[in-house]
Amino acid sequence: MRKAFAVITVLALFLAATPAMAGGQSAVKEARQGTAKFHQISHAEASGYGSTLDLLGCFENPGVGGMGLHYLNAGLLDGTVEAGEPEALVYEMRADGQLKLVGLEYLVPAELVDPTNPPQLFGRHFHPHPILPFWIMHAWIWRPNPSGMFMDWNPNVALCPEGVPVFGS
């Protein structure tokens, strides 16, 4: 009897999770389709994204992972989120000055968020940024992250090149 109950419970949990997982996968596909053109930085700039290097610097957390340079489209900071139209693009900064699109960041200004009902995307809730006034979610759709697709730091992203300003320092 216990075994049958356990099987039914697992099956019920699986069936309940399947739509969210499927929705998350279709949103990842939408994100990839909507941002593929931004591998060329000129397309990102033409679409309203701009570098945050002078304002925020490059993001890294030695021993945990990199986050790179963010290109922000301030016009998208409107409280809505769409998988194929992220508020920020995340680029790995290479020592030779080249930028490589590695991920996306979705941001909602904190004043537009009810903390008891945070924004969601990919079947996951956003979390508050520890310093900046935003609720955020990263999606490492262009560089696999062994820590998880939606973790903040990616150990597969290089740390900031020497001489580049680093956020928080």
Spans of model-derived segments:
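Positively charged n-region of N-terminal signal peptides that target proteins for export
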Residues: 1-4
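Bacterial N-terminal signal peptides
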Residues: 8-16
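Sec/Tat signal peptide C-region and signal peptidase I cleavage site
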Residues: 18-22
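Primary mode marks residue(s) on the alpha4-beta5-alpha5 output face of response regulator receiver
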Residues: 23-169
